[in-house]
Every structure is written in structure tokens, then in C-alpha cells.
Amino acid sequence: MDTMYWKDNTLFLLDQTKLPIEVKYVKLKTYEEVAEAIVSMKVRGAPAIGAAAAYGMVLGVMGYRNDQNLEVYLKNVYETLKNTRPTAVNLFWALDRMWKKYLEVKNQTFEEIANALLNEANSIFYEDIELNKKIGAYGLEVVPENASILTHCNAGALATAGYGTALGVVRAAFEAGKLRKVFADETRPLLQGARLTAFELLEDGIDVTLICDNMAGYVMSLGLVDLVVVGADRVTANGDVANKIGTYSLAILAKEHGIPFYVAAPYSTIDLNLTSGQDIPIEERNPDEVRKIGDRLIAPPQVKVFNPAFDVTPAKYITGIITDRGIVRPPYKENIKKLFGGK
């Protein structure tokens, strides 16, 4: 199923807060609605957020009225979308790309500007699918025969324009006949592993076993995991990785058990402007996400909650970063620079 699609000047977005109980698409006609969908995690996953924000810019220009300067108006659209979530760098990458396109065509007619922005958003969307397939192809190199892969959160088709990053590697292994099974962490507090990854893999006929987050170490100790593959929301210049909370713990467990730990992400997730993971802003979300599952209270309503959405895994715990341009291995600072043509 599609994470999102564009039709009749409307962004149709799969509401991932309803999965797996209900498959429902919401119709978004304004950039404000796109911003709300990102904040509320109707759409989530770094590449998917970027693509949605790009279409949000298109909806922004389509909602323009002649009562103010177009550039001032569009800058406000840009800032509104940019301020939705602070950690996933693909959001800023996609918005910067859309803004650059606007600056290229700003002297053209309004209709030409709108068409140029729509074409750019479409390019971001369809390019992401191709990037993910390349990630899958490169990742296949590190997957042993008859592999059992553990993954965290959801870095699949639902988190991207299609195919997935970490699950792109899983899909490539499945298609090549190299995959035995997948262990999916449930991923508290919003259960993306249980609700989304398990759902997505079952839809594809892939053998998946769901485990609680705190079972991962024991599963590894039993020799049931050959490698760990996760996605990323931001990779810094030194190879540190911000990803869904709980990733850091998995990386330490994998290292303790001698299990390769790979991160799968497109080049757009790498932020060369940040020297290390200490520079990454970590989003802290509503405490009720921990106090409740759905609408049901599972903890005392007055209890204090710490709810960071992401953690940072230091590069020393990462075996390799699987990108659409190849697999980056240590030393990361040097080899990430090479990935972008630097020396």
C-alpha cells in the first residue's frame, strides 16, 4: 500500500496512527494540515516526513492569495513545516530543496512556479523509492545465507516513499532467498515495530516474530540473530546515528554478543553540518504517549515521564552504514566525506 500519493491537488496520506486496525487515508489540502500530520505522526519515518513536507510546500503555494508577497508567504510555509519535528534531517533537506527550486523559478508566472514545485516534490518522492532499492541491493552484500535479522521501530515502506531502508535490506534478502526470519522489536512507547513493521512484513509474506524491546538481549544470547539492521533519522559527519529510542541499547547488546550492527539510510539522512551526535536536537514528546497505550491509561496519570523520541548511537558501535551510494565503514569521518566526493 502507498504511504502517500498526490491526486487532484490533494495529498492523500496513510494515517499510520490507525494501523494495523484500520487502513485509512486522510485528504490534506493545506500545508497546515500536512504540518499537523507530521506532528501527530500520521506520517513518520525520516524519508516519508521529507516527502510529505515537500508536498506541503506545494499545497502552500496552491493556497496562496494575492494579499501578500509570495516569497514572504512561502517562507512562512517553509518555517511552519520545518518546525514540526526537530530530529529527522530529511525534513530540512527536502524543504531546502523545495526552497531552492522556488528561488530558481520565482520570476516566472505563478502557474509555472506551482508546477515547478509540484514537479520537484514528485522528484523527491520517486527518487526516494529508487534510493531505497539501491540501499537494499548494497545491504544484500552483508546478509549471510539463511539469515535471521533483528530490526527496531519501522524503517520500511511505511517510513519512506516506498520499499524502505532497513526493511529494504530485509526485502532484498527475502527476494534473493537469503532470509530465514525477522525479529521485530515492538518499539515502545508508540509501538511502531508491533503496529507497523509486523504488519508490513506479514503483508509481504515475510516470516516475522514480534518481541518486546527488553527481550532483544536474551534473543541474541540464544544465537537467534545473525545481524541487526535499523534505519536512521540523522547521521552526523563522524558516523554517530540518531534513530528511534532504544536503538542505542540494541547496538550495545549487539556488540556484546558479536553481532554485526548496520544502519540503513539514504544520503539525504547524512548531515555533514553536524560533527557528532552530541549536536543532534532530540525531540521530546507528549508524556501521555508513555502513560497510555492508545486511549487507555496504563500508569498513574500524575506520574512524571521522560519521553525522548530518539537516542544517539555512537559510531563505535556501528559495523557499517548502508547507503544508496555504497556501504560506509570505519573510519567514518573520512569515509563519509568520501561518499560526498570529499577527500
UniProtKB/Swiss-Prot annotation:
UniProt binding sites for substrate: 44-46, 85, 192, 243-244
InterPro entries tied to this protein: IF-2B-related, IF-M1Pi, IF_2B-like_C, Initiation_fac_2B_a/b/d, M1Pi_N, NagB/RpiA_transferase-like
Active site: 233 (proton donor)
Pathway membership: Amino-acid biosynthesis; L-methionine biosynthesis via salvage pathway; L-methionine from S-methyl-5-thio-alpha-D-ribose 1-phosphate: step 1/6
A biological-process GO annotation: L-methionine salvage from methylthioadenosine
Site (Transition state stabilizer): residue numbering on this chain: 153
An annotated Gene Ontology molecular function: S-methyl-5-thioribose-1-phosphate isomerase activity
Domain of life: Bacteria
Keywords recorded for this protein, A-Z: Amino-acid biosynthesis, Isomerase, Methionine biosynthesis
Pfam family of the protein (one): IF-2B
EC number from the UniProt entry: 5.3.1.23
Catalytic activities: 5-(methylsulfanyl)-alpha-D-ribose 1-phosphate = 5-(methylsulfanyl)-D-ribulose 1-phosphate
UniProt similarity note: Belongs to the eIF-2B alpha/beta/delta subunits family. MtnA subfamily.
NCBIfam families for the chain: eIF-2B_rel, PRK05720.1, salvage_mtnA
HAMAP family assigned to the protein according to its UniProt record, in alphabetical order: Salvage_MtnA
Cited function: Catalyzes the interconversion of methylthioribose-1-phosphate (MTR-1-P) into methylthioribulose-1-phosphate (MTRu-1-P).
Protein name, UniProt field: Methylthioribose-1-phosphate isomerase
Source organism of the structure: Carboxydothermus hydrogenoformans (strain ATCC BAA-161 / DSM 6008 / Z-2901)
